[in-house]
Structures are given as C-alpha cells and as structure tokens.
Curated annotation (Swiss-Prot):
It comes from Scolopendra mutilans (Chinese red-headed centipede). Its main location: secreted. InterPro entries: Snake_toxin-like_sf. It comes from the Eukaryota. Residues 25-46 form a propeptide. Expressed by the venom gland. It is found in: Secreted. Belongs to the scoloptoxin-05 family. This is Omega-scoloptoxin(05)-Ssm1a. Negative results: does not show insecticidal activity. The scoloptoxin-05 family has remarkable similarities with the three-finger toxin family commonly found in snakes.
C-alpha cells in the first residue's frame, strides 16, 4: 500500500499548496524612533498584523529614505492596508529619494525579502518521492 500513502500525501500537499491559508498576514514591524532595531540591517521577526482603521492589513510595506548623495538614511517596515504606488521611488524636495515597496506574503518586507512559499516545499517533497 505504499502507493496509496503517496497518493494521500500528494493530495494533501496539493490541497495545502493550492488553497490559500486563512490567517493574519505576518510582517516585519520596525517603525518609529522608539524601535530597538535600526530597521536597515537588523529587524525583529515577522509578527501578525493588527487590524488597521481601513480594514485588515493586506500588505507588508517597506519605506526607504535616501539622502541627496544616495546614502540610505531611514528604513521603516510595517503593516499596511493599501499597496505602495506603482512607481516605487519618488524624488524629494531635499534632493533625496523616497522608495516604497509592498508585498503580501508573510515576512516579505524583511532584509532578505523572500521566504520560501508552500509551493517550494511541495516541489522539494515531490523531488524526494
């Protein structure tokens, strides 16, 4: 009956991979002067986003401010109910630049920027079978 076990495992993994899980989005939250992290290179683990005044948090956001000579001055990471504009970076009156990014998977606003998705795990298990 090993083939029955493989079929059951395949069906379970397919269901888990294709059906989105119902849970609160988890984002890295490192925002404001009272943070214990500098947000540029160190940051806390992703946490569940609270409900915001505009509804649920559908996006993780990262906002970076650059000086006029191109140095990264400030980084903020937070939960957001709206996506960043399609033009990621805008010029500031000070000569610097403000770049905004948004994503909608757990921990996607970290320094690494990506975490493996369920599909990656699914493919890895299939390769082992």
């Amino acid at each position: 009956m090993p083939s029955l076990c493989i079929i059951a495992l395949f069906g379970t993994l397919t269901f888990y991979t294709l059906i989105p899980s119902i849970h609160t989005l988890k984002c890295v939250r490192c925002d404001g002067p009272m943070s214990n992290y500098d947000c540029k290179t160190t940051y806390p683990a992703a946490e569940e986003c609270p409900s915001l005044s505009g509804g649920s948090s559908n996006y993780c956001s990262k906002k970076e401010t650059f000086t006029s000579n191109g140095n990264l001055e400030q980084t903020r990471r937070y939960c957001n109910s709206v996506a960043a504009p399609s033009t990621a970076c805008t010029d500031l009156k000070t000569g610097g630049k403000l770049c905004e990014y948004s994503c909608n998977t757990d921990g996607c606003n970290s320094v690494a920027g990506m975490e493996p998705t369920r599909a990656v795990y699914f493919i890895a298990i299939l390769m082992l079978a």
